[in-house]
Regions:
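Secondary-structure end/capping motifs
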Residues: 219-298
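Sec/Tat signal peptide C-region and signal peptidase I cleavage site
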Residues: 19-25
Length: 327
C-alpha cells in the first residue's frame, strides 16, 4: 500500500511540475470524425478534467475523415482519431503512428430506405459515406463484393462528410442508404429504416477511436505526447468502467435522450479494447485489410504503423498507483 501511495504522489508531482514548466495550459488540437461514442475516451477526458490535470487545453475539432488525415499530416492538428483515413496515408509513406485504440471492431451499420430489404436491392442506388477512400467506404465496398456488387459501378458512393450530413440525406431521400454510426443507426431504426448490415457481426477489424500522431511530434515533444496519452487513458478507463457516469456525457455532447444514449452505450461497450491497445493479431488483420484495399503487394512491418509502448507503460504506472476512475 505504501508503494502505491508513493507512486500516486510521484505521478501527481510529475504532472504538477510539468504544468508549472508550461506556465499555462498548452493548447492541443485533436481531429475527430464525429462526437459520438467512437471518440468517448477523448470527450470523457476533456469533460472530467483529465487533460486539465496534465496542463492541457484540448480542442476537439470535428472534420471529415479525409480532411482529418490531411490536417494531421500537415501539422494543423497534433492528434487525429480517424484510423480509416490515416492507415492508407501510412501505407503510402506518411510518417504517422497509432499509439492508442478504443475499439477493435467497425462501429458502423448500413441502413437503407424501408423498401430496400437486402443488399442486392442497392444495385443502381446511391449510398452515403463520409468520404471516398475512408474506412467506412471500404467496408461498404467489401460487403458489396460478397453479394456480387461493385462499389462505384453497380452502386454509387457519395462522400457527404460528417454523420449528420449522411443522416439528413437518407431522411430526405437524396440517397438510398448510408453507412451510419451510433446514435444515428438507432435513430434510423426507430424511424422505420431497414438495417442491411451490422458490421459488428462481420469478420472485419477496424481500430476505431485510435490516437494517431506524426512521428516528428513524438520525437520533438515526447512530454506533451505522454501527458495527452495519460489523460486519454484515464478518460478511456472511466468510459469503460463507469456506465452511469458516461451516459450523461453522451447526452450532453450529442443532445440525446438518456434512453437513447443508454442503448448506444450498451451496443458498443462490448467491442472496447481491454487497455487501449490491440493485439498483434488484430494489428495484422487491420493492416492486411488496408493493404488489400490499396492494391499493395504486401503489408509493411507492424512497427511501421503501430507503437503501443507508451500506452502500455502509462497503463502500468496507473495500475501500480492504484488509479481508479471516480464513480
Amino acid at each position: 500500500m505504501r508503494e502505491k501511495s508513493r507512486l500516486k504522489i510521484l505521478i501527481c508531482l510529475l504532472t504538477f511540475v510539468g504544468f508549472l514548466a508550461q506556465g499555462e495550459a498548452r493548447t492541443v488540437n485533436v481531429a475527430v470524425p464525429t462526437l459520438n461514442m467512437v471518440v468517448i475516451a477523448f470527450t470523457v477526458a476533456k469533460e472530467k478534467g483529465y487533460y486539465r490535470e496534465e496542463g492541457l487545453e484540448v480542442e476537439i475539432i470535428w472534420m471529415s475523415a479525409p480532411v482529418a488525415a490531411q490536417a494531421l499530416i500537415g501539422g494543423n492538428v497534433e492528434f487525429s482519431t480517424v484510423s480509416g483515413a490515416a492507415l492508407p496515408a501510412i501505407l503510402r509513406g506518411a510518417p504517422l503512428r497509432f499509439l492508442f485504440t478504443t475499439y477493435n471492431r467497425p462501429m458502423f451499420w448500413l441502413y437503407a430506405k424501408p423498401e430496400i430489404s437486402d443488399i442486392k436491392g442497392l444495385r443502381g442506388k446511391k449510398v452515403a459515406v463520409s468520404g471516398i477512400g475512408s474506412g467506412p467506404a471500404h467496408l461498404l465496398i467489401e460487403i458489396l463484393k460478397k453479394y456480387g456488387l461493385e462499389g462505384g459501378r453497380d452502386v454509387a458512393l457519395l462522400g457527404l462528410g460528417v454523420q449528420p450530413n449522411q443522416y439528413a440525406a437518407l431522411l430526405s431521400g437524396s440517397v438510398d442508404a448510408a453507412m451510419m454510426a451510433p446514435p444515428y443507426n438507432v435513430m434510423l431504426k426507430e424511424a422505420g429504416f431497414y438495417e442491411l448490415v451490422s458490421f459488428l457481426k462481420e469478420d472485419f477489424v477496424e481500430l476505431q477511436g485510435s490516437m494517431i500522431i506524426r512521428q516528428e511530434l513524438l520525437r520533438s515533444d515526447p512530454a506533451l505526447v505522454e501527458r495527452f496519452v495519460r489523460g486519454t487513458l484515464k478518460g478511456f478507463r472511466y468510459a469503460r468502467e463507469n456506465r452511469s457516469g458516461t451516459i450523461p456525457i453522451l447526452v450532453r455532447y450529442q443532445k440525446l435522450r438518456e434512453e437513447l444514449a443508454a442503448k448506444y452505450y450498451d451496443l458498443v461497450r462490448p467491442i472496447m479494447t481491454l487497455d487501449g491497445t490491440a493485439s498483434e493479431e488484430l494489428q495484422k488483420k487491420f493492416l492486411d485489410f488496408g493493404t488489400v484495399r490499396l492494391g499493395l503487394k504486401e503489408s509493411p512491418p507492424l512497427q511501421r504503423v503501430f507503437d503501443y509502448s507508451l500506452t502500455r507503460r502509462i497503463n502500468g504506472q496507473l495500475e501500480a498507483a492504484g488509479w481508479k476512475p471516480e464513480k
